[in-house]
Each structure stands twice: as C-alpha cells, then as structure tokens.
Amino acid sequence: MKIKIKSLFLTTVMLLMGIHFQSDVYAHADHDKDANVITMADIVIGIQHYATAKDQKHLQAIIDSDSSTADEKIIATAIINIQHQATAGDKQKLQEIIDNTTPTSTVSALATIVHGFSHGISSADKRKLQTIKFKG
C-alpha cells in the first residue's frame, strides 16, 4: 500500500512539474511572432528626424519578407519615409491600422507612435517601445 501511495505521489508531482514547465515553453513559443514589431520598435527608439541607412535596410527586409503582415509592411514603409515626421499618406494608412486593431496590441501601439512622430519620440513613447522590446 505504501508503494502505491508513493508511486501515485511521485507521478502526480512529475505530472504537475511537466505541466508547469510546458506552460513556460508555450509562453515563449510565439516569441518570434513579434520579431518584426520588436525590430521596428528598436529602430524608432533611435530615430532622430529620419531612419539611418542601416535602419532602412532592416525595414526594407521586413517589407520584402513574405512572413511580414500587411500592417508590419505599412509601418515599416512609414518609418522609412519619415523625414522629421510621417508623411500624410503614411499617417492615413497608420490611422487605419490604429482604428482596426485592438488598442492594446503592439502593432497598434507602434502605429500610434509612428503616426505621432515629430523629430523624435516622447519619453512616454520610448517607454512603450521599450516595453514592446522587453515583452516581445
């Protein structure tokens, strides 16, 4: 009887440990899903007036990638086109993203920041972008 209880106890502990560690795997399973958003957030943090040539190469890679979403391509294009602020045409497309996505989404947050970009970003926007990079 003692062996059955001990065996049942060990099995239960192992099962609970497996469930616990599996949830950690699932929590980070889609980490790369937001890789483009994280890259763009990192670029926008460093922009002063316009994106550097190096940043533009990274953004162009996002635009050219088949795995990038339409929203990611629009945001990347808007960042490339920034000359002190987003262009009027890009602002219109960014506003469509903002209006059609969940306000708490990283895509919506990034679109909002790029839409409001003017010679740089505010401290509050920088914190939002750093949060996007951290949570990725």
Language-model features: locations:
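Structural recognition of alpha-solenoid helical scaffolds
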Residues: 39, 51-58, 74, 78, ...
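Immediate post-signal-peptide N-terminus of mature secreted/exported proteins
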Residues: 25-65
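Short, linear, compositionally biased motifs with a strong N-terminal bias
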Residues: 12-14
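Short, solvent-exposed mixed-charge patches
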Residues: 134-136
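Solenoid-like repeat scaffolds
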Residues: 65-68, 100-103
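C-terminal segment of classical bacterial N-terminal signal peptides
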Residues: 16-24
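Bacterial N-terminal signal peptides that target proteins for export
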Residues: 1-10
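Fold-core signature of tandem repeat domains
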Residues: 44, 59-63, 76-82, 94-98, ...
